[in-house]
């Protein structure tokens, strides 16, 4: 069974081969962008070997098939060939599992009957010609042998409908026919326009001139006929609202002001009123409710000018109600679900921050009720921090009641809203924030708490002492709601087969590795110890997943979702808790500590750290990957030599270190000035990786 399929499958699979060694392979690679042939890794290894007897270490290799140059420094995977090879291999395995049962006599006869029907199209040409109209000769005129066709053409011209019945049955049993209704024809056979031919018809001198076509005339045919079927000749009507003067026929049903026109519309099947959209119907109704200064008389409507100036004036009058103020008060109350992206204004600012700075409390309240995210930062500051800067107690109350994080660190100084309220000596806001759970122990980048900043202000110090002695609960930070769709990134594409990916529930979407912020990152853990062992190939991707908000889960979660789709929302049970790098120390619960820091909007690990990366590539990570990792972890990274400033504060999470870090390598020479421990911290790539995995900054050994 399936013998022919197996032979064809084997033929296709063997065709996916290396162009040099001619062996079928699934891991083929492209060398450069000039040659489009693929090579296996064994042949690539022979290319990269240094040729003997030559001084130059770089050899120029040519493709044996197309003679184009090969670039061994730019190796890219042949994804399409790999997918085809894997799919064919998987299909071959499935066919091998199928039993070798033979077809029964009835099944074999049924199959042969299908083949016989496909092999006997003897009368296909005759049936096709029967459905075609009689064509003229090559010159577009009737021949001498076509006298009997003239009668048929006259009958065709006497047809009432100007087009063929496009809704008739064109099955094999039905014959092609025209509409049965007849109409008189005033056009002779010779005056009829010839059909398309390969050679244009020559003009005749005595031929009458063709009628002038009016481009702006109605598209409905001039000759009336009784045809119950729908025709494609429908008169176009404007869809503009009735408030303007150009849409007489575009009115809602039953809203016609002229009874004569309404009567015509009901009689003419080609002039039915077009139903309006909700927005056009509402504008039409509002236009009718406006009081008119003059009584309505059956006089001619004066023609309005279509100049650019008048159109701009009318557009301003009609859209004046859509100002940012009314937009915030009316339109924002439509959606109740919370959005990550907030509304924009003419100034390009977020609507919350713009409303606070312009003291537009109604617009702020409408935006919050519409579900705008109250914790979205702009220039490093939350809307609540901006409200404290502007000393707007009412805006502060609206944002706090909507779930704004009070203890979020904002700006380059990493201060909370309570720090800013104490600096501005606003006793009302300080007392309100403390009553809602503001923390007194949080430090800023300079290491100062709120108590230390309020030493010179007795009123604020008295308020702080009052809440310090009372037993109160800090503001609880609620985790963000789960996404309706999960964007899952696989650390290794070979974790799941193509058939397993197709069986995943609809809420799970597999995304490529270059996606910025996936919701889940799937890794492989040890079955016994449940430890994630990080190798050299995936160290960069796993470090990015740890310091970002995405959840790191094991592969068992996807396999459980394939068996039971209800396991999609049980992803926290499959979170990775233990991680180890290069068979070293096992770090436990540090990934969860990173996620809590992001949720609470607290300073990240490298806050206040400045990294200098002199080498473009290190043992495990290159410079672009290091830039992304350090900046995502709250630090600064640069490839230029840093400028030493003694006023720079120390790192937030280790005040005993200097803020300047130099990333060195054992194979890279470091200048003597960077060995000064009073100004620089010499750290290795291993120290950086362990600091992220352990979520702590330790004192470097050098």
UniProtKB/Swiss-Prot annotation:
GO molecular-function terms, A-Z: ubiquitin protein ligase activity; zinc ion binding
InterPro entries for this protein: Ankyrin_repeat-containing, Ankyrin_rpt, Ankyrin_rpt-contain_sf, BRCT_dom, BRCT_dom_sf, Znf_RING, Znf_RING/FYVE/PHD, Znf_RING_CS
GO cellular component, one term: BRCA1-BARD1 complex
Pathway: Protein modification; protein ubiquitination
Regulation: E3 ubiquitin-protein ligase activity of CeBCD complexes occurs at DNA damage sites. Following DNA damage, E3 ubiquitin-protein ligase activity is reduced by caffeine treatment (inhibitor of ATM and ATK kinase activity).
Region ranges (Disordered): 153-205, 281-346
A Pfam family: Ank_2
GO biological-process terms attached to the record: DNA damage response; DNA repair; positive regulation of double-strand break repair via homologous recombination; protein K6-linked ubiquitination; protein ubiquitination
Reaction catalysis annotation: S-ubiquitinyl-[E2 ubiquitin-conjugating enzyme]-L-cysteine + [acceptor protein]-L-lysine = [E2 ubiquitin-conjugating enzyme]-L-cysteine + N(6)-ubiquitinyl-[acceptor protein]-L-lysine
Disruption phenotype: DNA damage repair defects following ionizing radiation with reduced ubiquitination at DNA damage sites. RNAi-mediated knockdown results in elevated levels of chromosome non-disjunction that manifest as a high incidence of males, impaired progeny survival and chromosome fragmentation after irradiation and elevated levels of p53-dependent germ cell death before and after irradiation. Absence of S-phase checkpoint function.
Record note on modification: Autoubiquitinated. Phosphorylation of CeBCD complexes is required for E3 ubiquitin-protein ligase activity.
E.C. no: 2.3.2.27
Domain BRCT: 601-702
CDD domains registered for this protein in UniProt: RING-HC_CeBARD1-like
Residue stretches of biased makeup (Polar residues): 174-188
Top-level EC class: transferase
Summary of subunit composition and partner proteins: Heterodimer (via RING-type zinc finger) with brc-1 to form the core CeBCD complex. Brc-1-brd-1 heterodimer-containing CeBCD complexes bound to chromatin are activated as an E3-ubiquitin ligase in response to DNA damage. The heterodimer interacts with the recombinase rad-51 following ionizing irradiation; the interaction is direct. The heterodimer interacts the E2-ubiquitin-conjugating enzyme let-70 following ionizing irradiation. The heterodimer interacts with the pro-crossover proteins msh-5 and syp-3. Interacts with smt-3, tac-1 and ubc-9.
Protein's recorded name: BRCA1-associated RING domain protein 1
Taxonomic path: Eukaryota, Metazoa, Ecdysozoa, Nematoda, Chromadorea
């Amino acid at each position: 069974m399936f013998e022919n399929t197996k032979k064809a499958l084997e033929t296709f699979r063997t065709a996916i081969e290396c162009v040099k060694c001619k062996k079928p392979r699934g891991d083929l690679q492209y060398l450069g962008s000039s040659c489009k042939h693929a090579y296996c890794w064994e042949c690539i290894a022979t290319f990269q070997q240094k040729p003997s007897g030559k001084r130059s270490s770089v050899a120029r290799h040519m493709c044996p098939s197309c003679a184009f140059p090969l670039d061994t420094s730019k190796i890219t995977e042949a994804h399409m060939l790999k997918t085809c090879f894997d799919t064919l291999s998987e299909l071959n395995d499935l066919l091998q599992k199928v039993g070798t049962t033979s077809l029964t006599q009835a099944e074999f006869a049924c199959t042969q009957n299908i083949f016989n029907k496909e092999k006997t199209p003897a009368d296909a040409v005759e049936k096709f010609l029967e459905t075609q109209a009689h064509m003229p000769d090559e010159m577009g005129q009737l021949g001498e042998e076509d006298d009997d066709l003239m009668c048929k053409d006259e009958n065709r011209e006497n047809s009432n409908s100007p087009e063929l019945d496009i809704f008739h049955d064109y099955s094999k049993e039905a014959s092609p026919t025209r509409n049965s209704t007849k109409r008189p024809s005033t056009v002779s056979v010779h005056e009829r326009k010839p059909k398309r031919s390969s050679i244009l018809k020559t003009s005749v001198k005595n031929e009458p001139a063709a009628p002038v076509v009016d481009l702006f005339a109605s598209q409905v045919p001039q000759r009336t006929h009784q045809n119950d079927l729908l025709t494609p000749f429908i008169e176009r009507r404007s869809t503009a609202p009735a408030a303007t003067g150009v849409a007489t026929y575009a009115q809602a049903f039953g809203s016609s002001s002229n009874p004569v026109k309404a009567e015509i519309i009901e009689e003419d099947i080609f002039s039915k009123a077009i139903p309006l959209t909700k927005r056009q119907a509402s504008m039409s109704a509002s236009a009718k409710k406006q009081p008119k200064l003059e009584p309505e008389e059956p006089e001619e409507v004066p023609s309005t000018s279509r100049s650019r100036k008048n159109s701009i004036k009318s557009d301003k009058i009609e859209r004046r109600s859509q100002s940012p103020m009314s937009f915030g008060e009316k339109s924002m109350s439509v959606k109740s679900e919370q959005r990550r992206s907030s509304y924009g204004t003419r100034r390009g600012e977020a609507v919350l921050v713009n409303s606070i700075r312009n003291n537009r409390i109604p617009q702020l309240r409408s935006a919050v009720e519409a579900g705008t995210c109250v914790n979205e930062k702009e220039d490093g500051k939350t809307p609540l921090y901006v409200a404290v800067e502007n000393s707007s107690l009412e805006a502060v109350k609206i944002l706090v009641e909507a779930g704004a994080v009070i203890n979020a660190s904002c700006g380059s100084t990493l201060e909370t809203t309570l720090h800013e309220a104490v600096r501005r000596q606003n006793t009302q806001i300080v007392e309100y924030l403390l009553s809602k759970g503001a923390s007194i122990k949080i430090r800023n980048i300079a290491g100062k708490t709120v108590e230390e900043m309020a030493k010179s202000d007795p009123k604020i110090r008295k308020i702080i002492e009052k809440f310090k002695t009372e037993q109160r609960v800090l503001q609880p930070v609620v985790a963000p709601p789960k996404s309706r769709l999960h964007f899952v990134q696989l650390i290794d594409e070979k974790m799941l087969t193509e058939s397993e990916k197709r069986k995943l529930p609809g809420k799970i979407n597999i995304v490529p590795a270059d996606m910025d912020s996936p919701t889940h990152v799937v890794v492989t853990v040890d079955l016994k110890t449940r430890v994630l062992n990080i190798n050299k190939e995936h160290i960069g991707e796993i470090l990015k997943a740890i310091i970002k908000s995405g959840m790191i889960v094991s592969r068992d979660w996807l396999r459980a979702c394939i068996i039971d789709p209800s396991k999609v929302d049980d992803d926290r049970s499959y979170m990775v808790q233990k991680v180890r790098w290069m068979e070293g120390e096992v770090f436990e619960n540090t990934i969860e500590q990173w996620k809590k820091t992001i949720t609470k909007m607290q300073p990240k690990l490298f806050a206040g750290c400045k990294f200098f990366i002199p080498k473009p590539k290190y043992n495990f990570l290159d410079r672009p990957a290091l830039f992304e990792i350090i900046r995502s972890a709250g630090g600064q990274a640069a490839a230029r030599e840093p400028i030493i400033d003694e006023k720079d504060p120390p790192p937030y999470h280790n005040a005993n270190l200097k803020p300047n870090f130099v990333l060195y390598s054992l194979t890279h020479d470091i200048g003597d000035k960077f060995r000064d421990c009073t100004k620089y911290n010499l750290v290795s790539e291993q120290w950086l990786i362990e600091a992220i995995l352990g979520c702590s900054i330790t004192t470097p050994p050098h």
